[in-house]
């Protein structure tokens, strides 16, 4: 299926910043900044074509859609907590007024909260810890609840409840569920919200029903209207580096790989997108390609592998709502900056069965794989789908592979019992909720609720099988890849981007400069790594 962009050209992306630059005064002055990440948020407003126009997003089995634009003619502690380690109930937050039994959401006039210290008030008279970056401001939750477990009362209820479930202690389970129900709320500080999401997940686990936990009232990507989904996604990219940072590093890595190739202007750049950006990542890259000193590639092919409906419906951040279609906007923007862009969409196609033929790869093109936050859903036990897929990528002989993943331990049933896995899931969600409180400066917003509801799928999704960075690096090496050192542009650009966010965010360059990590309050969140074919590897095929 072929789609043509709007025939009217638009102003350059820099013109769309008019009236918006004041939001980022210091960042734009940075010598190594990647201003495209600011610009791209305003790109989508330029093309106000309905999100439902163009090709239908409804997937059919192993469907491939081709879309073309041309610049000329447009054809925690991981061990379960025992009861003797639990916080006394007298130390827990004061009981809230009764909540609605069905949704956990309290009435507007009954929204009692725990009285705590102001977010930046020191404990026991200690001085407030200085910001690591002098020019940055720490917003939202900046108390002792980040690096330390102190003050994180929701986990002190959720984790013992999971341990009681695993141990079959019915009385204790009932008691802790009751306390959680009294304290949980979808609004308020991160503890209240974590308690609400955790209570819903535990209830779902105990239920014999196979219905999705997201049907109980939580707002997620799939339940939103396409325009609001787009608005929420762009807002999140503006206020949090959770995804914008790895996307920034990935785009810089693509440019780094491209710079090492010859005859760029007469060749095709083919990007295999196995990610969760839903198009937000690519305007910045297209803009950078249009400004290359030697000119852009003759053709830029973007092959988007969407998440499978049957397998990844509950996978966080991977599925857009029905009707969401960013392709016309992206094609229109590419045309306006003289980039010959082609978009190929592969739907309902399992990652394990991808090959050079299914993505229509050709030997003379520059193939770069961008795999972000999707591969950890592949099984790593028996069968080991994860290692097998990396070998599939190796057999495609890409010029570069960018791997971005959550940097946390696996929480599947094969790597521990229910209590241990649930504790790790709760730890992941705490970091997300705590960081979004800072990102949105503690304000309630529908955009924040959508992102948090989507992240909360990690508590119930059985395909959420993370691995730490070291294990991922080992898998890549076993598959026949060698780590590539990040260039200065990628590292400096990442640091410059991070300066505009809360000072509790931190970037760490690791693994001999072949991995860049994103950390929140001293704890790892994700990593981004760059890989090339290992010249010493003689196998590679399977």
UniProtKB/Swiss-Prot annotation:
Pfam families: GRAS. A motif (VHIID) lies at residues 269-273. Disruption phenotype: Roots of knockout plants form few aborted and non-functional nodules under nitrogen limitation when inoculated with Mesorhizobium loti. Low level of arbuscular mycorrhizal (AM) colonization in roots inoculated with the AM fungus Rhizophagus irregularis. Residues 145-532 form the GRAS domain. Residues 367-452 are annotated as: PFYRE. Residues 455-532 are annotated as: SAW. Highly expressed in roots. GO terms for biological process: nodulation. Its main location: nucleus. The keyword Transcription applies. Transcriptional regulator essential for Nod-factor-induced gene expression. Acts downstream of calcium spiking and a calcium/calmodulin-dependent protein kinase required for activation of early nodulation gene expression. Acts as a common symbiosis gene that positively contributes to the early steps of the arbuscular mycorrhizal fungus and rhizobial infection processes in roots. Transcription factor involved in the positive regulation of the beta-carotene isomerase D27, which participates in a pathway leading to biosynthesis of strigolactones in roots. This is Protein NODULATION SIGNALING PATHWAY 1. It comes from Lotus japonicus (Lotus corniculatus var. japonicus). The lineage of its organism: Eukaryota, Viridiplantae, Streptophyta, Embryophyta, Tracheophyta. The gene is NSP1.
């Amino acid at each position: 299926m072929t789609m043509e962009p709007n025939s009217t050209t638009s102003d350059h992306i820099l013109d769309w910043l008019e009236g918006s630059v004041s939001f980022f005064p210091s960042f734009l002055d940075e010598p190594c900044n990647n201003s495209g990440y600011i610009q791209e948020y305003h790109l989508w407003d330029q093309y106000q074509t309905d999100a439902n126009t163009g090709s239908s997003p409804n997937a059919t089995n192993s469907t491939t859609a081709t879309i073309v634009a041309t610049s000329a003619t447009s054809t925690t502690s991981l061990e379960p907590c025992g009861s003797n380690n639990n916080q006394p109930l007298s130390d827990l937050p004061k009981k809230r007024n009764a909540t609605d039994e069905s949704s956990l959401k309290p009435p507007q006039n009954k929204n009692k909260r725990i009285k705590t210290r102001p977010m930046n008030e020191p404990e026991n008279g200690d001085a407030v810890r200085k910001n690591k970056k002098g020019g940055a401001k720490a917003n939202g939750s900046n108390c002792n609840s980040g690096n330390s477990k102190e003050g994180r009362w929701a986990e002190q209820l959720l984790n013992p409840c999971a341990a009681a479930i695993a141990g079959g202690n019915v009385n204790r389970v009932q008691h802790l569920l009751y306390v959680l129900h009294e304290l949980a709320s979808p609004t308020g500080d991160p503890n209240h919200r974590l308690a609400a999401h955790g209570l819903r997940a535990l209830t779902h686990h105990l239920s014999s029903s196979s219905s999705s936990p997201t049907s109980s009232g939580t707002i997620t990507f799939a339940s939103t209207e396409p325009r609001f989904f787009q608005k929420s996604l762009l807002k999140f990219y503006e206020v949090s580096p959770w995804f914008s940072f790895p996307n920034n590093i990935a785009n810089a890595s693509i440019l780094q790989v491209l710079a090492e190739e010859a005859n760029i202007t007469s060749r095709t750049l083919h990007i295999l997108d196995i990610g969760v950006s839903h198009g937000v990542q690519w305007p910045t890259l297209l803009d950078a390609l249009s400004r290359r000193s030697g000119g852009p590639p003759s053709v830029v092919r973007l092959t988007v592998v969407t998440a499978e409906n049957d397998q990844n419906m509950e996978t966080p951040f991977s599925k857009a709502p029905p009707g969401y279609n960013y392709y016309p906007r992206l094609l229109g923007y590419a045309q306006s900056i003289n980039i010959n862009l082609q978009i190929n969409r592969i739907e309902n196609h399992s990652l394990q069965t991808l090959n050079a033929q299914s993505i229509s790869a050709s030997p003379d093109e520059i193939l770069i794989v961008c795999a972000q936050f999707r591969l950890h859903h592949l099984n790593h036990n028996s069968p080991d789908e994860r290692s097998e897929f990396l070998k599939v990528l190796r057999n495609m002989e890409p010029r570069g592979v960018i791997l971005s993943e959550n940097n946390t331990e696996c929480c599947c049933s094969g790597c521990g019992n229910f209590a241990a896995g649930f504790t790790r899931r709760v730890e992941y969600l705490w970091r997300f909720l705590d960081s979004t409180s800072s990102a949105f400066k503690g304000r309630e917003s529908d955009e924040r609720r959508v992102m948090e509801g989507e992240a909360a799928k990690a508590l119930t999704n059985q395909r959420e099988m993370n691995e730490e960075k070291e294990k991922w690096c080992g898998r890549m090496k076993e598959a026949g890849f060698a780590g590539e050192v990040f260039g200065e542009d990628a590292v400096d650009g990442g640091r410059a981007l991070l300066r505009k966010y809360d000072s509790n965010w931190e970037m760490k360059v690791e693994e001999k400069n072949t991995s860049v990590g994103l950390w929140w309050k001293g704890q790892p969140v994700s990593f981004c790594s760059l890989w090339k074919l290992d010249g010493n590897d003689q196998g590679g095929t399977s």
